[in-house]
Amino acid sequence: MTQFDLLVRDVRVVRPDTDAVENVDIAVADGRIARLAPGIDVAEAADVFDGGGKLAFPGAIDTHQHWGIYNPLDVDTVSESRAAAQGGVTTGITYMRTGGYYLNRGGDYAEVFPEVLALSDGRAHVDYAFHLAPMQRSHIDEIGSLVDDFGVTSFKIFMFYGGHGLHGRSEDQAAFLMTPPGERYDYAHFEFVMRGLQKAREERPDIADRLSLSLHCETAEIMTAYTKIVEAGPLRGLEAYHESRPPHSEGLAITIASYLAHETALPTINLLHLSSRKALEAALIMAEAFPHIDFRREVTISHLLTDIDTAGIGAKVNPPIRPRDDVEGLWEHVLAGDVDWVVSDHACCRDEQKFGADRDNVFLAKSGFGGTEYLLSALVSEGHKRGLTDPQIARLTSWNPARRFGLGTKGTIAEGFDADIALVDPSATWTVHAEDSESSQEYSVLEGLELSAKVTDVFLRGH
């Protein structure tokens, strides 16, 4: 009888806690890493995989996905989790809320969330979890039960939803939000969400550090005003969308969110998809102003790889794709260690859904697109060019998100951890084509981009 279920031999193991990349074999038993050592006897394993000297990264943890936003959740869970695995992602955490899109219904999570779980159960090709957004007053009262009964540890606020639409200006956000009559989704609601989550943390000290709040930081009033100005002017495409949602809208929202966290004594705050120099600057200023708050800062791979001149309207997303100077600013902060994790913000939006009747009108297009299938390959490719080390990449894509979101057996390649492994050929040159993707989205905002690293093999708990 063999000691191990799987032996992945001849790989260069990348770990987040050491600068050394080790030439070792990885032995797996019962879905966990059982031994790391050079020259493990192949006779000890039931199955042997030759890694061919490739880099072995801990499986990426893509903590920002949107399964089911534009397509049925049961369908997206299958196709988009396959795309995730294609990108070296072994764990996806996807956002879910009530209101327009997703299940397209309001109500309490006690009724809605079991339906979400049933629709996704048994369909994913990767491990997964859900962040939940308290959209109405009753959801705040449910935070404790969502933690205790369903294991939810992460909650979200969309700061602009109360007064500005998902795709642009909106005259009736209440209908979109599907909240009870008389309720408002505003700063007061955000404060009460924070107080509700902090109460849950205080009542559960053993897991308090795993309970956090993520925020999409843009300011509705600024965006509505600027959208009217831009719509009346000559700008078109991604430049117009960028100008309609200016970077200082992010900075102001970050400032407000941070002070509310200070006021409510909620110390676990995640600032999502920061897209501009001003957003990162505001986030760092707030971290200095409120050192007792454990801020985590996120950027997306698309904001690191595209700008308003390299992509078309298919790249409409919130916050917007920015000019090249903002892209360079994001990279400066990534290299300086100011960013905690890199994600995809994957939201599969097929061509027939994405564009309006006038395909050239960015304000008629829907927001969001896919890209999880390129997460690790693209970050290794572009990161190596800019001096990002492999251990830094492992921290940005696996270790840091695992620690924040309480995934205690994930995040590194070490004995006792889940055997979630992504093999990367760091010298494979290839070109992005949407037709090669496992996603059901028919286009890619990275179409034609040449990458110099590629995920070749992925193991989820040793399979």
What are these regions (language model features)?
Residues 1-57:
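Histidine-rich, glycine-flanked metal-binding segment
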Residues 11, 26, 31, 53, ...:
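Divalent metal-coordination and catalytic microenvironments
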Residues 51-123:
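Metal-associated gating/positioning segment near the N- to mid-region
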Residues 74-81, 137-146, 256:
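Short, acidic/polar
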Residues 94, 129-132, 268-273:
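Short catalytic-loop micro-motif centered on adjacent basic/acidic residues
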Residues 141-157, 161-342, 347:
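Histidine/acidic residue-rich metal-binding segments in metalloenzymes
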Residues 235-266, 336, 341-342, 348-422, ...:
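His/Asp/Glu-enriched, well-ordered alpha-helical/loop segment
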Residues 356-361, 415-463:
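C-terminal cap of metal-dependent C-N hydrolases
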